[in-house]
Amino acid sequence: MRRNCNAGFKSPVQSPSSSSSGRGSEYSLQKEVSELQGKEAALDQEIAQLESEGFSMAELEEHITLLHEYNELKDVGQMLLGRLAVLRGVTTKELYAEFGMNLED
């Protein structure tokens, strides 16, 4: 069976003209904006509550920076363990045991 390569292609993505009327899409955009504004207000309230409890945005940003640094270092460690395992012809699981590391780390 041979298919005609020149047959029409029906895209799964609807074109703006084939979607709902302009009013419907405008309504859905307004609804989405309203939902996002509600989420923003809730987040602002949560931030205010955390600040009233003594937390600061600067402290949070510092923690996030440190977590990124930790994750980068952990990734490098994992890469080194993987290379060492290949060189020794063992699994990384065996290296974890050899170095007294927990697999959950």
Swiss-Prot record:
Residues 11-28 have a biased composition (Low complexity). Pfam families: Swi5. Gene3D superfamilies: 1.20.5.170. Keywords: Coiled coil, DNA damage, DNA repair, Nucleus. Residues 28-54 form a coiled coil. It is found in: Nucleus. It comes from the Eukaryota. GO terms for cellular component: nucleus; Swi5-Sfr1 complex. InterPro entries: DNA-repair_Swi5 (IPR010760). One of its GO terms (biological process) is double-strand break repair via homologous recombination. Residues 1-31 are annotated as: Disordered. Its main location: nucleus. Signal peptide: none annotated. Component of the swi5-sfr1 complex, a complex required for double-strand break repair via homologous recombination. Belongs to the SWI5/SAE3 family. Component of the swi5-sfr1 complex. This is DNA repair protein SWI5 homolog. The gene is swi5.
